[in-house]
Amino acid sequence: MKERLDNLRKRLVEVEKEVENPNLIKDVAKYKETMREHSYLSKLMEEYDNYLSIEKQIEDSKLLIQEESDAELKEMAREELHSLEAAFEKSEADLKMLLIPPDPLEEKNIIMEIRGGTGGDEAALFAADLFRMYTHYAEMKNWKYEVLSLNETELGGYKEITFSISGKYVYGSLRYESGVHRVQRVPETEGSGRIHTSAVTVAVLPEAEETEIEINQEDLRIDVMRAGGPGGQCVNTTDSAVRITHIPTGLVVICQDEKSQIKNKAKAMRVLRSRLYDLEESKKQAERAQNRKSQVGSGDRSERIRTYNFPQNRVTDHRINLTLYKLDAVMQGSLDELIDALCIAAREEMMKAADHHLEHK
């Protein structure tokens, strides 16, 4: 580990020279990447210096215990050694964690897609509930959200809804929400009081900037049509709805919420760009993971990740076996306990992988 950290210290010196270069600012993408690396390496070296300082203090304390004849001073040195060893253990764990390079995607804004699955109207109603849950959470975090596409049912549910959330560390917080969310409750439309089980699929995509993914216009088929409302009726007399098909991948995006065709096209392109970016990132992630399957962050959208049981006021996350009896608060956007637990579990998995890597180096 020390050899790797010493090499990274040399790299920091190189990066500092790059930062001092006045021409760096001319290349915005390179500037951002360099500043991100500088920030990461500076933080890493600060912890490494702390680690080396504690290591030296431990050596000094051991030497003092060995050579000191005064019993009282010897006991004081032993006590100090005990606290230093605990601090050393923590610093070593922090270093291992820091040695896992930060995922640049974590700082990104997101596009979230929620689709009603099995359960018909009840699934669509729960999709609307999840949308409200996430937007309440966004408001608590002072994030902004914008609906990009919506397909509403006559009962006020959503067959599907696509929206963006922008703010600080959005993808890092919500990336583990991708998957199947199962709900168990008595539907409002159910007269007999029987509990029904429905499912909703959530996809969380890091929002791609225009410079990050190139889309050739000849790869797109753009159709315009009249916007439809609940039950299929036309709600617009002009051809403002836009459907974009990306021919190479077969991805289709429809936006019809704006009265302007130009605005709908711009929104559809945002969604398409992020879906294509997500496809690329998923391939890279699969290559990196290869033999290591992450329980927390697999992002498999067909995986059942959470159950919301309304009669018992219970929410269970199946990936980390966490159950909370505060579903009412969760549905109002109190997601921190769930999200923090998922992030900690993912970090622990990464630390185990880092330990394995260091052991077999």
UniProtKB/Swiss-Prot annotation:
Q: Which Pfam families does the protein's record reference?
A: PCRF, RF-1
The domain of life is: Bacteria
Region feature (Disordered): 282-310
N5-methylglutamine modification sites? Q233
Post-translational modification note: Methylated by PrmC. Methylation increases the termination efficiency of RF1.
Identify the InterPro entries for this entry: PCRF, Pep_chain_release_fac_I, Pep_chain_release_fac_I_sf, Prokaryotic/Mito_RF, RF-1
State its location(s). Cytoplasm
Gene3D superfamilies to which the protein is assigned, alphabetical: 3.30.160.20, 3.30.70.1660, 6.10.140.1950
Gene Ontology cellular-component terms for this entry are:
cytoplasm
Using the record for this protein, list the coiled-coil segments as residue ranges, or answer none.
Answer: none
Q: Which SMART domains match?
A: PCRF
GO molecular function terms listed in the Swiss-Prot or TrEMBL record: translation release factor activity, codon specific
User: Which keywords does this chain's UniProt record carry?
Assistant: Cytoplasm, Methylation, Protein biosynthesis
Q: Which family does it belong to?
A: Belongs to the prokaryotic/mitochondrial release factor family.
* Stored HAMAP family: Rel_fac_1
Protein role: Peptide chain release factor 1 directs the termination of translation in response to the peptide chain termination codons UAG and UAA.
What is this protein's name? Answer: Peptide chain release factor 1
Query: What species does this protein belong to?
Result: Treponema denticola (strain ATCC 35405 / DSM 14222 / CIP 103919 / JCM 8153 / KCTC 15104)
